[in-house]
């Protein structure tokens, strides 16, 4: 996360931030579960029901649990340095808490959450992390990710974030 508040034009605010110029549309085909070519590499996977009622397949139980926990925080206010579920979270506070609840300890700072295995954009699965130099978000499936904006919200998957350097997509459970 960043210091200060979260102005509408800042890294967390405003509809469509970072999703223009070939953003959301090209991601729509990813994370469709068992019909993806690499699904065999993950076995059956673990189902997750998203807020819209659709079902996606996480690669394993830890990733599924992390996504389920993260989704419970939708609407929670952004708080710089925040690590308290239901009260206030920053970006890395959200992802660290969700994975800790799933039994996996990951680093606190966003830019240090590029752990596990690097994942190609075409191989994204629920629970994978999108990591920037000062922000992190978690892929939930169907072309969306959850992130601590103001408040915690679902956004289209993207690789740009207010000019921050993108460190890639990562699977902490790999």
Sequence positions of predicted segments:
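Aromatic- and glycine-rich peptidoglycan recognition patches
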Residues: 108-112, 116-120, 134, 140-174
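Structural motif
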Residues: 127-128, 135
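Catalytic cysteine-centered active-site loop
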Residues: 74-126
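Short acidic-hydrophobic sequence patches enriched in Asp/Glu that either
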Residues: 62, 90, 161-165
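Intrinsically disordered, low-complexity
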Residues: 1-77, 166, 172-174
């Amino acid at each position: 996360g960043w210091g200060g508040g979260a102005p509408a034009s800042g890294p967390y605010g405003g509809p469509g931030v970072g999703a223009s110029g070939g953003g959301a549309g090209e991601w729509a085909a990813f994370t469709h579960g068992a019909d993806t070519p690499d699904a065999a590499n993950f076995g059956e996977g673990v189902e997750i029901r998203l807020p819209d009622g659709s079902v996606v397949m996480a690669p394993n139980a830890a990733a599924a649990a992390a996504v389920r926990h993260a989704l419970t925080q939708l609407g929670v206010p952004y708080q710089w340095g925040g690590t308290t579920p239901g009260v206030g979270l920053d970006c890395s506070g959200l992802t660290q808490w969700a994975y800790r609840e799933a039994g996996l300890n990951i680093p606190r700072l966003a830019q240090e959450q590029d752990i596990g295995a690097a994942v190609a954009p075409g191989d994204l699965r629920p629970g994978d992390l999108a990591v920037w130099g000062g922000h992190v978000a978690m892929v939930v499936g169907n072309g969306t990710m959850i992130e601590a904006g103001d408040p915690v919200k679902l956004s289209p998957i993207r690789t740009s974030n207010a000019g921050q350097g993108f460190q890639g997509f990562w699977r902490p459970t790999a």
